[in-house]
Amino acid sequence: MAKEIVRKAKLQFPAGQAKPGPALAGVGINMPEFTKAFNDQTRDRGQEPVPVLITVYKDKSFEFKLFTSPTAYKLTQIAKIKKGSSKANKEKVATITLDQLKEIAEYKLPDLNTNNIDSAMRQIAGTAKQMGIEIEGYAEWLKKGTN
């Protein structure tokens, strides 16, 4: 018989730096056990934020699933900016190439709701547009259709 799920919680911690605290206290798990396991699994991911889904069972056991870093984080990293534009449709803050867009799409593909790289690129491009980041050659790529 499957374990009864009591709660699911989506949280985000810096890679290798999860600490017991208020965010974890509300989840109702063994915090030291989680932080050790999380930090061990994410230590090699540098300073990037790591989203995690924690599933808590009735017997207080838990399991967690790690996800890829947020798209906005990857875009700011590649574009070498601190944050996106507050007026995205009027003020462009950076430009990235189509190859860089594809690189992010390939990285994010396991967590997106598609298996098609072109669809993933369109999703990432939407986030870039909302952040005021232009993509060189994107309009031509769209007109041309899929690669």
Swiss-Prot record:
InterPro entries: Ribosomal_uL11, Ribosomal_uL11_bac-typ, Ribosomal_uL11_C, Ribosomal_uL11_C_sf, Ribosomal_uL11_CS, Ribosomal_uL11_N, Ribosomal_uL11_N_sf. GO terms for molecular function: large ribosomal subunit rRNA binding; structural constituent of ribosome. PROSITE patterns: RIBOSOMAL_L11. Keywords: Methylation, Ribonucleoprotein, Ribosomal protein, RNA-binding, rRNA-binding. CDD domains: Ribosomal_L11. One of its GO terms (cellular component) is cytosolic large ribosomal subunit. SMART domains: RL11. One or more lysine residues are methylated. Belongs to the universal ribosomal protein uL11 family. Part of the ribosomal stalk of the 50S ribosomal subunit. Interacts with L10 and the large rRNA to form the base of the stalk. L10 forms an elongated spine to which L12 dimers bind in a sequential fashion forming a multimeric L10(L12)X complex. Forms part of the ribosomal stalk which helps the ribosome interact with GTP-bound translation factors. This is Large ribosomal subunit protein uL11. The lineage of its organism: Bacteria, Bacillati, Mycoplasmatota, Mycoplasmoidales, Metamycoplasmataceae.
